[in-house]
Structures are given as structure tokens and as C-alpha cells.
Amino acid sequence: MKRVILHCDLNNFYASVECLYHPELRDKPVAVCGSIEDRHGIVLAKNYAAKKYKVKTGETVWEAKNKCPGLVVVKANHSLYYKFSKYARQIYEYYTDRVESFGLDECWLDVSESTLLFGDGTKIANEIRERIKRELGVTVSVGVSYNKVFAKLGSDMKKPDAVTVITENDFKEKIWGLPVEALLYVGDSTKKKLNNMAVFTIGDLANCHSEFLVRQLGKWGYTLWSFANGYDTSPVAKNDCEIPIKSIGNSLTAPRDLTNNEDVRILIYVLSESVGERLRSHNLKGRTVQISIKDPELQTLERQAGLDIHTSITSEIAQKAYEIFLKSWNWSKNVRALGVRVTDLVESDTCTQISLFSDDIKRQKLEILDECVDRVRERFGYYSVRRGILLQDRGLNRI
């Protein structure tokens, strides 16, 4: 059976939901931010009116307001967005049980076996588009294709409120002329490497020798070559299929450039608290800590190191992340953003190898401390309990 894959992308999702609840904002440039009090708060989403002023996701509030003085800044309401995401998913699940989330605002649907009931992929896509608009009051762009990568490309090609079809017969004409960074998983770093090889479009990538790409990019080179040529065969997960968590991490763009080790240490603790809490909430612990460091020119360095024992203890994660940073960064440039991630995960009650060098009594106390902090924050809010190190710079500890 020929596959029929949809990719549904709710347009300007956060901003669209806010405008739905605040109709007076509908014709104004709007940005949704993590913090509206802090001028260094980050833009999480924006509407089309703000896009006309070249407001970008990920830039600071003050940068956005410099571009658009009339910008209306709204504090993010994640519980509301989650509710709308769930409503959209219920509509998708009317057509298929194969619905795979890609963030709150995007989903893949495999409707291959649904076409006998509901019509072809284009008909299903248009029906979903109309229902989302009618029942939820927001719009969605839908890509229709025979694989996940091209379906995602299709939903990106026409916005808002549109359906784009990419077939086996016309994909070269429709997508090979697009910039290579339009392809799924081609980020800034990979784009730069490909551009240095004179690969600027998806067609350039598709027409490279796969062996050459493997030599330059490793196994990932072959994967990207396959994507560009339409060979993606990855399945859409069933909606009742629980995908195992392989890593837990968090990253932040600092409200100002970090200029010394103590700045970095503070931000690493902020990130490690988030990572540790999420590990504990999922009943997981990990043995490998990864960090990513981005400079003001957006160049990224990634490093990792192992721990002596699996852990979800915040202070152990932070200490290892800071050790990696000290070994990896020579301060030839400032630091713009940091990320901390824990991998090599196992369930917390899994028997693991004992380290001869760990202090079990001290570790038990730290585990109890973290659990107590989690409970207090759950009841009274995140800022009800703070580590002393985070009081050294209030500009960093409130992000």
C-alpha cells in the first residue's frame, strides 16, 4: 500500500491562541515571551503582523521592540497552549490512530489506511484544515506526501491555512530548488558545513555522491542524502505507543553575554536544576552529561563526559557540566547560550554498577534534598526555594 503522510503545523500557535483570547490584539504585532518584565526575556512566538517587522523567535524582547516599537508583549500561558494542542490532536485522531507529535504545534499523521473511509490525502488534509479553523479558531498548514520529511516540507511551504501536496512524481520540481536548510534536521552548523562543500540547495544535496557526504558528515551525511532523494521510510508512531526517553536536557540564551566562569557556573546550575527535576519526575537517572556552548557569532561547541554512577542529583549534574566547560572553553569569545543534557538513561530503580569512589550516605542526603525541593516548588512555585549560588546575579537566576 502506498503511504499517505500528513504533517499538520498550527500556524503561529502561541500567538494565535493569545489573539483568540484577546481579540483586541488580532491586528497588532504580538510576541509571546517567557517574561514580559525582563527586557532580556526571549521571544517564544510571534504573529504575522510582528513578522513583517522581522521579529524573530529566540531574540530578546528589547531586540524585538527595537525592530517594532509598537510590539505587544504577552506572557506565555503554557497550560492554555497544551489544552489547544490536545484539542487539535483529538481532531487528528478522528482520522487515524497513527499520530506522532513533533512539539505542541506539529504532528505527523499516517492516513494510508484511512483513505477508503475519508478520501485521498488532499481531501483529508482540507477537511482537517477546515475543522481546526471552525472548531478551534486557529489555522493550520498541512503538508501531504509519501514520507514524513516531505510532508513536513510541504507544511512549511505555504502558510497560513494551506495544503501543499508533494508527490513522488513532482518532488524534484517542488523542493530541489529550496535552500538546504529547509530540509528537516539541517541546522546552522550542518548548513555551514554543506555550504562549504558548495551544497546550497536540497537539489545540490540530492545530487552529491552519498559516499562523499559520509566522509564529510559521517552516517548523518547518508541520512540527509536519503531525505533529499525521497527515501525516508521512517514510520509514524501510533498514538498509544510510548516512545522511550533517550535524553533530557535544557538550553538557554543568556540575558547578556557571559564573560567569566562564575557567570557560566550560575547558568549551569539554573539548567541543571531543570534537567534534574525532569529526570526525577520521569523516574530516570543518567550517566553521561553533555554541554553545548554557543558564542555571540552563533558558533556551537558540544562536549560530553561520563559520570562514575547513574544520577538524577542536581548538584552532581551541575558539577560535571561545569568541569566539562572548564576543560573545553578558553574564553577567546564570550558565551551567548548554554545547554545541559543528560543521556545514557535508566529507570531510577534499575540496579547499576556501584562506584568505589562515591559517598553513598552523602548521595542519599542529596537525593532527599532534591526530592524535598521538588515538593516545595510543586506547591509554592519554582522561586520559593533557591540555591545560594543563584543569588549572586539576579539577572541570571530569574531566567
UniProtKB/Swiss-Prot annotation:
Mg(2+) binds at D9, D105. Belongs to the DNA polymerase type-Y family. Keywords: Cytoplasm, DNA damage, DNA repair, DNA replication, DNA-binding, DNA-directed DNA polymerase, Magnesium, Metal-binding, Mutator protein, Nucleotidyltransferase, Transferase. The keyword DNA repair applies. Residues 5-187 form the UmuC domain. This is DNA polymerase IV. The lineage of its organism: Bacteria, Bacillati, Bacillota, Clostridia, Eubacteriales. It is found in: Cytoplasm. Poorly processive, error-prone DNA polymerase involved in untargeted mutagenesis. Copies undamaged DNA at stalled replication forks, which arise in vivo from mismatched or misaligned primer ends. These misaligned primers can be extended by PolIV. Exhibits no 3'-5' exonuclease (proofreading) activity. May be involved in translesional synthesis, in conjunction with the beta clamp from PolIII. Its cofactor is Mg(2+). It comes from Acetivibrio thermocellus (strain ATCC 27405 / DSM 1237 / JCM 9322 / NBRC 103400 / NCIMB 10682 / NRRL B-4536 / VPI 7372) (Clostridium thermocellum). Its EC number is 2.7.7.7. It catalyses: DNA(n) + a 2'-deoxyribonucleoside 5'-triphosphate = DNA(n+1) + diphosphate. The gene is dinB. One of its GO terms (cellular component) is cytosol. PROSITE patterns: UMUC (PS50173). Pfam families: IMS, IMS_C. The active site is at E106. One of its GO terms (molecular function) is DNA-directed DNA polymerase activity. One of its GO terms (biological process) is error-prone translesion synthesis. The record marks Y14 as: Substrate discrimination. Binds 2 magnesium ions per subunit. It comes from the Bacteria.
